[in-house]
């Protein structure tokens, strides 16, 4: 009996853990997010409007036909369509981005703490990849993508995309969260507020402390 009860408890805990790993499933047709809490219901971090007052515009966005501006340090631009742009996405567990890359531009190493990403390339040539966890010996999974190719970045894995062509590239990606979140590794480590003690980073990255200070100066917000 003790063994059976232990198995039940382990199974229950596993199910609870899985349930918390992704956006909760909706318990209604939709839950259009609003900022005004008056007469609203709080779900998934957003207040929901009365469903009888929902309209088509709550489920609509435009502009993904427009190229993003890529004249920045990394030569790329991410245009996000999540619950902040389409309030009707609230509780639906999905969002979308358009990524524009200048020649030799990149979407630098980053991670989405709340979502798996599936990317399709529609223009140009990209070198993409992700690195697995310490438990899997930090293996690199990488491919060169051409238009029509698709690649998946598992939830939480550090990943990147680089335009290896001489012409602009365009990709679209779906994310398994209404608000996937993004942590850009270099910005986070070297550009935190307040900054991480450079001695800590020097030891962690096996760098001279002056090199770390220079990096922190480059990434300072």
From Swiss-Prot:
Residues 1-21 form the signal peptide. PROSITE patterns: GERMIN. It is found in: Secreted, Extracellular space, Apoplast. Disulfide bonds join 31-48. Mn(2+) binds at residues 110, 112, 117, 159. Belongs to the germin family. May play a role in plant defense. Probably has no oxalate oxidase activity even if the active site is conserved. This is Germin-like protein subfamily 1 member 15. It comes from Arabidopsis thaliana. The lineage of its organism: Eukaryota, Viridiplantae, Streptophyta, Embryophyta, Tracheophyta.
């Amino acid at each position: 009996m003790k063994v059976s009860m232990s198995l039940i408890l382990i199974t229950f805990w596993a199910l609870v853990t899985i349930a918390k790993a992704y956006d909760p499933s909706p318990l209604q047709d939709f839950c259009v997010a609003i900022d005004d809490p008056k007469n609203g219901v709080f779900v998934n971090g957003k207040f929901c409007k009365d469903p009888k007052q929902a309209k088509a515009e709550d489920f609509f966005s435009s502009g993904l036909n427009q190229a993003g501006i890529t004249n920045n340090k990394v030569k790329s631009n991410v245009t996000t369509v999540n619950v902040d742009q389409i309030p009707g996405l609230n509780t639906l567990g999905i969002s979308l981005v358009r990524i524009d890359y200048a020649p030799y531009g990149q979407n630098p190493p980053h991670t989405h703490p709340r979502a798996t990403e599936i990317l399709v390339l529609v223009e140009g040539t990209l070198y993409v990849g992700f690195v697995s966890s310490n438990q899997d010996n930090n293996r690199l999974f990488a491919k060169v993508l051409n238009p029509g190719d698709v690649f998946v970045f598992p939830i939480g894995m550090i990943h990147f995309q680089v335009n290896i062509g001489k012409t602009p590239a365009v990709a679209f990606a779906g994310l398994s969260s209404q608000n996937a979140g993004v942590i850009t590794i270099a910005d986070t480590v070297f550009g935190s507020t307040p900054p991480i003690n450079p001695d800590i980073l020097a030891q962690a990255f096996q760098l001279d402390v002056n090199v770390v200070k220079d990096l922190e100066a480059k990434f300072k917000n």
